[in-house]
């Protein structure tokens, strides 16, 4: 923990490593819909966050910004898990985690932010990596659609990061996360009703993977990605 507090890049590396693990887990759940996987990931993550921050349950009231972020997070996961089912893990994992590229472009266009050489270099490497990977893609209709969904899920995540950065200035980490995940789960439940998907149809083994997704790629990763130290990388 001392290393992470002193080295924000080590913290960022661990967070990104944790979030990338969700892509291959989906391959172990081929019979389940993307919405079902996403719903249980968010629901269990919300319960974990509530359990960790139970002392402030009655004293903190979530605001509309957290609701907005939660809705976009719900769409992010629905799109991401569907993209993993349609394209390769490598393409989904890369294209589904380029949200920082969108946030930086937002800063350039709307906030007139001047980027450092390090950030510009990072953006260049991210775009180069995406181009290199896609140049080797099969470009089938299914794969292409999956890649489009992965990019859209990153755009949705960019909204979550931008809103979260503002909210986290005055709200505690788990006070924010528990309601963020709760609203995302509620959004996914509504999506499942629209799709006529039964999110309660799964095996005991499937539930074990849900717990993993909630604990590692979500609680460990997404909560750390909203830390102030990460915002200043």
Q: Could you say what each language-model-derived stretch is?
A:
Residues 60-66, 93-96, 109-132, 143-147, ...:
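Loop-to-transmembrane alpha-helix entry segments
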Residues 16, 45-49, 103-105, 109, ...:
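Transmembrane alpha-helical segments that form core, pore/gating elements
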Residues 36-38, 42-47, 81-114, 153:
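Specific alpha-helical transmembrane segments that line the substrate/conduction pathway
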Residues 1-39, 68-71, 79, 140-166:
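Glycine-/small-residue-enriched transmembrane alpha-helix faces in small-molecule transporters
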Residues 7-17, 54-82, 145-153, 200-220:
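Loop-to-transmembrane-helix transition segments
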Residues 49, 73, 115-135, 154, ...:
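Hydrophobic transmembrane alpha-helices of multi-pass small-molecule transport proteins
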Residues 223-229:
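Conserved small/polar residues in nucleotide/adenosyl-binding loops
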Residues 25-31, 134-143, 194-209:
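Membrane-interface helix termini and inter-helical loops of multi-pass transporters
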